[in-house]
C-alpha cells in the first residue's frame, strides 16, 4: 500500500499562486511550469475569487499535477477555504488539504472534516513567533508556514506585530525557529533566488514563493533556478555536517 499524501508530504519547494499573482496568465500555466521545474507542493490562494472560481482553479491545478505524473507526492492545497476543499472533493477533484491562518478555521476542525490522511498547514506569523511555534498544539497540523524574510506586496498581512509594523526575520531567527518547532517548517515572504543558499543553510524544510515564480517573465526558468539553488544549498550543508 502506498503512502498517504500526509505521509508523502514534501514542502521543500512550495508554490503559492492565484489569479492576482500571474501577470494575467492562467494559473494552470504557472502550476505547470513549477511542476516541470520540480516544485513539490502547490497552494491555490486568492482573496478575490468566489468559491466556485476557487474550485475551478483547484480542478485545473489537479489536472496539471495528474498530467505531470506526480499526484502521489505533490500536494495540492487551498488557502483558508475548508469549504472549497470539501466541495472540490465531492466533485471528484484531488484536493489534498488546506492551509489556514491563525484567525481562520482551527486546524483541528479542518482535520475533523478532511480526515487523517489530509494535509493541514498553519501560518505562524506573530511577533512572538518562536514561542508560538514552540508552544502550539501541533497534533492536527502537518507543517508551519512562517515568514516573512522581506517585506512583500503579495502577502501584506505577513509578519506584522500588534501595532501593524512589519517584522522580517533574520537567518539566525529562522534557524532557531526550525530548532524549536516540533513539525516541519516552510519559510517564505519576499524570498528571491539570491536568498535561497542562505535559507537552505538553516534548518527549515523548504521555501515558499509567490511572485518569484508566478510573476517571473519565464516562470519555468525561475522555478528551476530556485529548486536547483535549494538542492545545492542543502547538499552543501549536508556535506559540511559529515
What is the role of each PLM region?
Residues 101, 141-150:
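Non-cysteine beta-strand/loop elements that form the S-adenosyl-L-methionine
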Residues 156-168:
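Short, flexible/disordered intra-domain loops and linkers
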Residues 44, 150-159:
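A short acidic, helix-capping loop that chelates divalent metal ions and anchors anionic groups
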Residues 1-97, 115-128, 132-142, 165-176, ...:
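Conserved N-terminal beta1-alpha1 strand-loop-helix module at the mouth
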Residues 93-108:
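Gly/Pro- and small hydrophobic-enriched strand-loop and loop-to-helix capping segments
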Residues 106-107, 151-152, 214-215:
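Short gly/pro/ser/thr-enriched loop/turn and capping motifs at secondary-structure boundaries
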